Swiss-Prot record:
Xref: InterPro entries: Aminotrans_II_pyridoxalP_BS, Aminotransferase_I/II_large, HisP_aminotrans, PyrdxlP-dep_Trfase, PyrdxlP-dep_Trfase_major, PyrdxlP-dep_Trfase_small
Keyword Amino-acid biosynthesis assigned: yes
Pathway assigned in UniProt: Amino-acid biosynthesis; L-histidine biosynthesis; L-histidine from 5-phospho-alpha-D-ribose 1-diphosphate: step 7/9
Protein name in the entry: Histidinol-phosphate aminotransferase 2
Any GO BP annotation: L-histidine biosynthetic process
C-alpha cells in the first residue's frame, strides 16, 4: 500500500518522519539467477541442520520455554574461536539489530557520527531513527577511505570493511589510526564480508579482522554476521566484539527492548556453524576462487572491476550503461544490483554465485556485447 493511502493519524511524529530501509529485492520466480543480495551460493554447514533437527527431535518440548537470554553457548564458541573472553562477545537477531543497538548505545545527539558517503544504506536510517546527526565523508576518487578525512569532532565512526558496495578494504593500520586518534569516540567496524578477505592472504596485515585490535583499543567495536560467510541469512544471527564495557552497554540496551533476541533454533544452528571450522574455511575459499574467475571474465568483456574483498564484485561496463545492462539481464531472469546514485550509477554490484550462475551471466553479457557490436558496425 502506498503511503498516500495509509491513515497515519494515530502515528507518532517519529513514525511519520522515518525513512525506512528498503531491503534488496527478493523475487521468488522459478529459474531465477539471483545475484543481487550477496547471499552465499553454498549451503550452510551440514552440522547446522543436524543441530536444529536435534533440538526439534529431542528437545521439542523445551520450545515452550524461553531460550537462554544471554546465548552463553554461542557466545562461548565465538569467544573460543577468536581467543576472547565471553564478556567481549555480544549476539543479536542479525547484525542489523546489533547495529541498531550500536547507534542507540554509543552515538550522541549533540555530536555527529561519521560514515563514508558510499556505504551500507542502513546507516542513515539508524541515524534518522535515533535522532543522530550523520556526517557522510566522501570516498576518494578511487573509492578508497582516507582516515585523514575523519579528523573532526564526533561521537563515533562507523565503517563497513570491506566496504559495500565497492568491496574495497581498509587496512588494519588505518583502523588502528582511527581508533587511536578518536580515543573518546566509539569506532565501529562493520565486518559483514571480512571472511572473504581474511582467508585470501592470511599473512597480510591488511587482510586481518579488526577483532585482533579490540584488546588494544577500548573504544573499538567490531560487528559481524552469520548471513554471508556462514550461509545463514535465513537464521538471522549477528554479533559484536569489543571491550567488556562496550558489550555491557549493548546488553543493557538489548534488554531494554527484547531480553530474548535469539531463539533456541538459531542458537543451536549458529553454534554448530562456529564449531565446523573446516567447512567454513572451505566454502569461503570457494567463494574467493569464484570471485577471481568472475573478475577475470568480466575484465575480458571490457568491464572495469574494483578489487573486491567481499562475496560480490563492483563492475562498470565499458560504456557506463549499467542501468541498461541490469534491465536487459532482468529480462532474461538474471538479477543484479544497480544503484541509481551519483558516482556509482555506472556500476553493477554482482553477487558471487555458483559456477552455473556465472556461466549464465557471462553468456548473457557476451550476447549483449555482440548485439552492441553489430549495431555499432
Amino acid at each position: 500500500m502506498s503511503e498516500s493511502k495509509i491513515d497515519n493519524r494515530l502515528w507518532s511524529s517519529k513514525a511519520r518522519n522515518l525513512s525506512p530501509y528498503v531491503p534488496g529485492e527478493q523475487p521468488q520466480h522459478d529459474d531465477l539467477c539471483k545475484l543481487n543480495t550477496n547471499e552465499n551460493p553454498f549451503p550452510p554447514s551440514p552440522k547446522v541442520g543436524e543441530a536444529i533437527t536435534k533440538v526439534l527431535a529431542q528437545q521439542a518440548d523445551d520450545l515452550r520455554l524461553y531460550p537462554a537470554p544471554e546465548s552463553e553457548e554461542l557466545r562461548g564458541a565465538l569467544a573460543a574461536l577468536y581467543n576472547l573472553d565471553i564478556n567481549q562477545v555480544f549476539v543479536g537477531n542479525g547484525s542489523d539489530e546489533v547495529l541498531a543497538l550500536v547507534f542507540a548505545s554509543f552515538f550522541l545527539k549533540n555530536r555527529p557520527v561519521l560514515a563514508p558517503d558510499i556505504s551500507y544504506s542502513f546507516y542513515p536510517v539508524y541515524a534518522n531513527t535515533f535522532g543522530i546527526e550523520l556526517v557522510q565523508i566522501p570516498l576518494e576518487a578511487d573509492f578508497s577511505i582516507s582516515p585523514d578525512a575523519y579528523r573532526r569532532p564526533c561521537s563515533g565512526i562507523i565503517i563497513a570493511n570491506p566496504n559495500a558496495p565497492t568491496g574495497l578494504l581498509l587496512s588494519l593500520a588505518d583502523i588502528r589510526k582511527l581508533a587511536g586518534e578518536h580515543s573518546d569516540s566509539v569506532i565501529v567496524i562493520d565486518e559483514a564480508y571480512i571472511d572473504f578477505a581474511q582467508l585470501e592472504e592470511a599473512s597480510a596485515e591488511s587482510q586481518m579482522s579488526a577483532i585482533s585490535l579490540i584488546n588494544e583499543f577500548d573504544n573499538l567495536l567490531v560487528t559481524q554476521t552469520f548471513s554471508k560467510s556462514r550461509s545463514l541469512a535465513g537464521l538471522r544471527v549477528g554479533m559484536a566484539f569489543g571491550n567488556a564495557s562496550l558489550i555491557e552497554a549493548l546488553t543493557r540496551m538489548k534488554n531494554s527492548f527484547n531480553s530474548y533476541p535469539l531463539d533456541k533454533l538459531a542458537q543451536a544452528g549458529a553454534t554448530a556453524s562456529v564449531l565446523d571450522v573446516e567447512y567454513f574455511e572451505q566454502t569461503c575459499q570457494q567463494v574467493i576462487d569464484l570471485r577471481t574467475s568472475l573478475t577475470a571474465e568480466l575484465t575480458a568483456l571490457g568491464y572495469d572491476v574494483l578489487p573486491s574483498h567481499a562475496n560480490f564484485v563492483f563492475a562498470r561496463p565499458h560504456d557506463g550503461a549499467a542501468s541498461q545492462v541490469a534491465e536487459v539481464l532482468r529480462e532474461q531472469g538474471i538479477i543484479v544490483r544497480h544503484f541509481d546514485k551519483p558516482r556509482i550509477n555506472e556500476y553493477l554490484r554482482i553477487t558471487i554465485g555458483t559456477p552455473s550462475q556465472h556461466e549464465r551471466l557471462i553468456n548473457a553479457l557476451k550476447a549483449l556485447q555482440a548485439v552492441a557490436d553489430v549495431e555499432a558496425s
